[in-house]
Amino acid sequence: MKTARRRSRELAVQAVYQSLINRTAAPEIAKNIREMPDFAKADEELFNKLFFGTQTNAAEYIRQIRPLLDRDEKDLNPIERAVLLTACHELSAMPETPYPVIINEAIEVTKTFGGTDGHKFVNGILDKLAAQIRPDEPKRR
């Protein structure tokens, strides 16, 4: 059974994905997501923080992620990009959530929406990113 927070993360990734693919305005995307049946079981506050925070800071997050990639940024799968951007926001702006939880949730969301081994790629990038963004947080794995 999925928690409200997991649903919020999944919906935020779907919203970020839509913004990457369709270039639709964030308020319109959020409205569409809120109309989805799963939204009633989600944490609306977390969804809003993740989606709108990611949208606001996406350019900065891309700058942080780019040096960690093993491929050209243009070759990133849009789902992987959406997961990485959303997790980068959570790592940067939500210190109350331990980074291993953020990474695990990102892996699970990638398993749901991404390609066969996409979760392994996301895990590797987020491990490096967490070490940069939260160098003083003890490793909890």
UniProtKB/Swiss-Prot annotation:
Record's keyword terms, sorted: RNA-binding, Transcription, Transcription antitermination, Transcription regulation
Cellular component annotations (GO), alphabetically ordered: cytosol
Domain of life: Bacteria
Pfam families, alphabetized: NusB
InterPro entries: NusB-like_sf, NusB_fam, NusB_RsmB_TIM44
Gene Ontology molecular functions: RNA binding
Gene3D superfamilies attached to this UniProt entry: NusB-like
SUPFAM superfamilies, sorted: NusB-like (SSF48013)
Biological-process GO terms, alphabetical: DNA-templated transcription termination; transcription antitermination
NCBIfam families from the UniProt entry: nusB
PANTHER family: ANTITERMINATION NUSB DOMAIN-CONTAINING PROTEIN (PTHR11078:SF3), N UTILIZATION SUBSTANCE PROTEIN B-RELATED (PTHR11078)
Known function: Involved in transcription antitermination. Required for transcription of ribosomal RNA (rRNA) genes. Binds specifically to the boxA antiterminator sequence of the ribosomal RNA (rrn) operons.
Family the UniProt entry places it in: Belongs to the NusB family.
Listed name of the protein: Transcription antitermination protein NusB
The species this protein was found in: Neisseria meningitidis serogroup A / serotype 4A (strain DSM 15465 / Z2491)
